[in-house]
Amino acid sequence: VHPDVRRMLLTQKCFAEGGRALVYLAAQQNDIVKKAESEEERKAADELLGFLTPIAKAFLTEAGYEATNLGVQVFGGHGFIAEWGMEQLVRDTKIACIYEGTTGIQALDLLGRKVLMTQGASLRNFTKIVHKFCQSVEGDEQMAQFAAPLAEVNKEWGDLTMKIGMTAMKNREEVGAASVDYLMYSGYATLAFLWARMAKV
């Protein structure tokens, strides 16, 4: 396989399988909300589900759109004609970025309501999960290539959030301006964690 074609196919695979893991994690939290034996467990799952929902909806629909665009590119000129159906898939995935809350609306929900309005509590709770995972694989040579960069991304996530929050106190437009990029960063960071966890298994 041509290296550039391999790059595109592996990107599609990353989004598809990582996205499935994200949806499973969200579904698991939903089950815990409904069946938790304690109020503390139910509340923690509900908070995590609320945090993950805009990431799952907006990041995965944007990733799906990117993946179908790559599909057109893999086919070359044939991807652009109706015979293969790729151009229809591009249209079908693009609408997912628009309905049930556009990417911009989901991004505002994540950054504005789920993160900044909680003074970063929901983000901290999730990044603690990631941090504990990174600590749990310390000393595992096979996991070092995944855990070290993941730990850096996890720390940077908190730093970026603080920087945006500080700027937003001076300029309210900052949240709207930064929200989509913040959501996409959050999506990549979340998928990085899930892929590292799958690599451990």
For each feature predicted by the language model, list its residue ranges:
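Flavin-dependent oxidoreductase catalytic core characteristic
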Residues: V1-V201
